[in-house]
Design a protein with these regions (language model features):
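Conserved catalytic core of the tyrosine transesterase superfamily
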Residues: 1-211
Length: 211
């Protein structure tokens, strides 16, 4: 606002400031929204501010359609993941719809193989829930346990009992996609979206998927 005293700032000054900061500098929608919110707070609480009824529109966040893998692409992805630990991680992300943080926090005693249940602690919204272990995952899970023998977590780093990391998962997922010749921008969350999409295609109730 070019050093203008707060008491002299009027609505038009704020509008021009927003335009200069956000539009001309091509800030992201999220940053634009933060600037608008900050200016509204400033106008509301500053004792000498003369701005009245400041109306600033927060730009709507862009809604991009999520990237989804086809069933064949999922098969190709897993076939090209040679390391059994990596394959177990990707298979569980897809077959259970877990978020990457939920998988990293998953402990062995949260997995009930006989009942095919996985207990997810502190999921989104800090809610606990159960997800079903796919029958097709059981043998891979057994082979993985026999090979790596993790101590506490479902997937661990080089040191026993220490959690694996998200960058490591993203790294081997990227390599597997390259080997499978999948040109989409695939992230661990893509596997979750793919899981939900494939359930919908099979006629599973949307409310069940959302839970």
């Amino acid at each position: 606002l070019k050093g203008k005293p707060v008491a002299e700032i009027v609505n038009r000054d704020v509008e021009l400031f927003i335009e200069d900061v956000c539009v001309k500098r091509r800030y992201s929608v999220s940053t634009h929204r933060q600037v608008v919110s900050a200016m509204k707070q400033f106008a509301s609480f500053h004792p000498t501010c003369r701005i009245e009824s400041l109306i600033l529109e927060r730009p709507k966040k862009s809604r991009f359609l999520p990237i989804v893998l086809s069933k064949q692409e999922v098969i190709d992805l897993l076939r090209n993941t040679r390391n059994i630990k990596h394959k177990a991680v990707l298979a569980l992300l897809y077959s259970s719809g877990l978020r990457i943080g939920e998988l990293l926090n998953l402990e062995l005693n949260d997995i009930d193989v006989d009942r095919r249940q996985i207990f997810v602690r502190n999921g989104k919204g800090r809610k606990d829930r159960y997800v079903i272990m796919a029958e097709s995952f059981r043998q891979l899970f057994h082979n993985y346990l026999m090979t790596y023998r993790p101590k506490r977590y479902f997937v661990e780093g080089p040191k026993p009992g220490v959690q694996y990391t998200a960058p490591s998962i993203r790294g081997f997922l990227k390599r597997a996609c390259k080997l499978a010749r999948i040109n989409k921008k695939v992230t661990p969350h893509t596997l979750r979206h793919s899981y939900a999409t494939h359930l919908l295609e099979q006629g599973v109730d949307l409310r069940y998927i959302q839970e």
